Amino acid sequence: MCGIVGYVGKRDCTEVLLNGLGKLEYRGYDSAGIAVFQDGKITVAKSKGRLKDLEEKMEREGRPFGHVGIGHTRWATHGEPSDVNAHPHSGGRVTIVHNGIIENYKELKDFLAGKGVTFTSDTDTEVVAKLLDYRYNGSPIQTISETVRDLEGSYSLGIIFADHPEQVYACLLYT
């Protein structure tokens, strides 16, 4: 089962997210990642393997710093464990983490591909990120509400929008 952590506050977001993900390690996972608002944009760091692997990767490539972000530990359901399939996933203006299964992700992916949207991972999560971005109209709540109506399955999402740098959105649907 995946683990999701979100943070908005005055402390170093990366530290808070990593600490939160560390508390979820007992659940088991194959990859980990975080997305942090840094210098006016969303910075994503993710890695196959343990949380320690993510921390070592950030030490080599740069550790994001900010005050708002989301984090994730993944237990693969779609796509093999890899850096590419690790969460968070971005659709451009929208970055998400996800727990659960989107049962109709293939149909949604085909719809988006028909509109010229491209994909880099094998995950249902990237499909949701791209669908949110495709539908984004400047209103996160309206976009999320319209998008989740089309998602079939049981899931929870942590979402950040590039133009709303002080907010983390979450939704949950279990059928």
Residue ranges and their predicted role:
Residues M1-L172:
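Conserved short alpha-helical segments that host acidic/polar catalytic motifs at enzyme active sites
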